[in-house]
Amino acid sequence: YTIMLNLNRTWIEKQGDFFVESPIILLAAIIWYLKIYKNGIYCTFPHAVELLNKPYSDLFTILTSYPELENYLSPFMDAWKGNAQDQLQGQIASAKIPLTRMISPQLYWVMTGNDFSLDINNPKEPKLLCVGNNPDRQNIYSAALGLYNSRIVKLINKKKQLKCAVIIDELPTIYFRGLDNLIATARSNKVGVLLGFQDFSQLTRDYGEKESKVIQNTVGNIFSGQVVGETAKTLSERFGKVLQQRQSVSINRQDVSTSINTQLDSLIPASKIANLSQGTFVGAVADNFDERIEQKIFHAEIVVDHTKISAEEKAYQKIPVINDFKDRNGNDIMMQQIQRNYDQIKADAQAIINEEMRRIKNDPELRKRLGLEDEKGKKPDKS
C-alpha cells in the first residue's frame, strides 16, 4: 500500500476500488514470493520491480505454483483464463506504469544490500537515521521514503526499546501510511512524533479529508507561526475562548453613561495568527500527571540563544565515511559500482524466471495442477 499510494496520491481516497486494489495486490504477491524464494535472499524492492516487468505469462505461472500465493492472484487468473485481455492488461498496467518511474541505478543501489537494520531504538544497536527527498524527483523518492517509514514504525513501536523520536519535515511530500496510529499508540512505547508542514490545507490535499482530520486532532502539542485562512481559523478554535470584559461608553448632551459586560471571545483570534511576525509563535502543549502546566496555551516570541547554538555546532563530530567509492589508486568508481549493481539486479530477475520455469517444466504433477500443456509432447528439460 505505502509504495503504490505514494506513487498515486489520488488513490488514497479510492482505497477499495478494483483498479486501485489490483496493482497493490499484484505487487504484494511478488514481494511475498521473493520472501519465500531461497529464504528471501532476493527480497528487495528493486527485484520486485524487475520481476513485475517480466512477461506476465511467466510471472503468473511462477507465482501460482506456490499454493500460499494463489489467493493473491485470483482476480488476475480469472481474467487470464477467461480471455479478458483488456481487463488483465489494465490491471497489470496499473502496477507497471507507476513503478517503472522508480527504475533507477541510484535508487536500486540504495534499496539493496544489508547495510544496517531499521530498528533504530534497539538497545543493543541504537542508530540515528536521516533521509532526505529530492524536489526534482519528489514523487518518485517519496515512495521509497514512505516504504522505509512504514517499516521503521512497525519495528520501533514496541515495548522494552530505547526512547526515540520520529521527526518528519514537509510531511505532505510523502504519504506515511499508519501515521495516525503511530501518534495514538507510540507514546506508551517512548516514541515521540514531530511533524512539520506549512498548512493544514496541504495535509488535506495529499492525505485526504478523513486522514488529515485524524492526524490534526490526535497530536497533543502544536506550534504555529504565521498561517492564514482555514488553518488560522482551525487553530483559533483549538485554542478556545475566554471570558472577557468589554466596556462601552455612551455620550450625549446631558450625560455620559458607561456599561460593562462580559462575553466569550477567541483567546487568540484568527486575525492575530494571520499577522504573526517572524520568530513569534502560538501554540498549545500537553502535560503529565506529575508535571502539570497551568498555562498550556501560549503566544510568544521564541528567543534563540545564538551563542549556545554556535558552541554546539563547533562540537559536532564528522560523520564517518562508510564507502568512499574509490579504488586502490584513489580513482572515483561510484558510477561503475552503481551500474554494476543495477545490471546484477536485472540479471538476478531473469535468472529467477529461468530457474523457476525450468522447475515447473520438470515437474509433471505441478504442470498438471497449473493446467499447462506438455508443449506438444516435448520431454521435460534435464538441464
Question: Which residues make up each language-model segment?
Answer:
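P-loop NTPase motor domains
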Residues: Y1-V191, D206-Y207, I273-S277, V285-R292, ...
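A generic structural motif
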Residues: K159-K163, L195-Q198, R246-Q254, S310-K318
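Intrinsically disordered, low-complexity segments enriched in serine, threonine, and glycine
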Residues: E294-K296
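Conserved ATP-driven motor cores of ASCE-family P-loop NTPases powering translocation/secretion/packaging/pilus
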Residues: I183-T185, N189-A286
